[in-house]
Amino acid sequence: MKLGARIFKTGIAITLALYLASWIGLPAPIFAGIAAIFAIQPSIYRSFLIIIDQVQANIIGAVIATVFGLIFGPSPIMIGLTAVIVITIMLKLKIEHTISIALVTVIAILESAGDDFLMFALIRTSTVILGVLSSFIVNLVFLPPKYETKLIHNTVENTEEIMKWIRLSMRQSTEHSILKEDIEKLKEKMIKLDQTYLLYKEERSYFKKTTYVKSRKLVLFRQAIITANRALDTLKKLHRLENEIYHMPEEFQETLTEELDYLLYWHERILMRFVGKIKPHDDAVEEGIRYKQLLTKSFLKNQQNTDEELIDYNMLNIMASAVEYREQLEHLETLITSFQTYHPKDCEIETEE
């Protein structure tokens, strides 16, 4: 199991909350530690956005718990009923992401009856808020996340895996069921990659120069993900049309294999440029135009010699996927060339997580 920064931040936040609660002299500091667990966030920007909601949820939970405690007295039944009401209110206010904090406050207030219930409720509410603030401080100060490095690493890793399967699929060297399972896994990885991209996008730059560079990087990374998704779409079609491709004209199969081989070679070179390992290679683009023309000519030629409409449709379908994949590669290379031309000092990229 890999220990990430968020795991360490959670531990630091719990420790800080417990120490601060003990130092101030708050009873039951354990509730500050519990609140710190639920309040930790994956990014600094998200911490700024959510802390107001967390404090608001804490206050709502405290008010409702105090009212029910004064009227009916603390009991397990009252804790359950109050929790249901608090959850309903959180959902109505569309701040369901703070339900856990509100419930911690409810339990902290109603778990025991003190002599002065109002003062008891106020102290417990303050204890939970202290846990929330401890997590906010840790998010702000300790171990700022490096989502750019993670984003690049995962983009390259996912793309390389997709290209590996395309090569095997073109040569009919794959087990249908195994490839199907791996395609589903790749879909999940691409969804997680989109989430990492959003976290990176949320990070804020505090200088005008770095803000401009980051905006260029965002466009570049977005296109790299789109291109990887087009490669995945091509793989899905190769897998779905595995038997149909086998019955296509032999010349078209050979031309399609050459075209996809070239696109994968081109994509590999772009990835190498993406991480700053090689220089641009103009001959690759010219060679790609030739393969594109050959694939189109082969399709038109074999379309005239083929009587079955289904084969024509499948040929057109797989060719359209290859053309779309190519267009995204062209756009990606244009963006990389532009970025490396105007921001040469920012081209050194860490690819290790």
Swiss-Prot record:
InterPro entries: ArAE_1. PANTHER family: P-HYDROXYBENZOIC ACID EFFLUX PUMP SUBUNIT-RELATED, UPF0421 PROTEIN YGAE. The chain crosses the membrane at residues 20-40, 67-87, 103-123, 125-145. It comes from Bacillus subtilis (strain 168). Belongs to the UPF0421 family. Keywords: Cell membrane, Membrane, Transmembrane, Transmembrane helix. The keyword Membrane applies. The lineage of its organism: Bacteria, Bacillati, Bacillota, Bacilli, Bacillales. Its main location: membrane. This is UPF0421 protein YgaE. It is found in: Cell membrane.
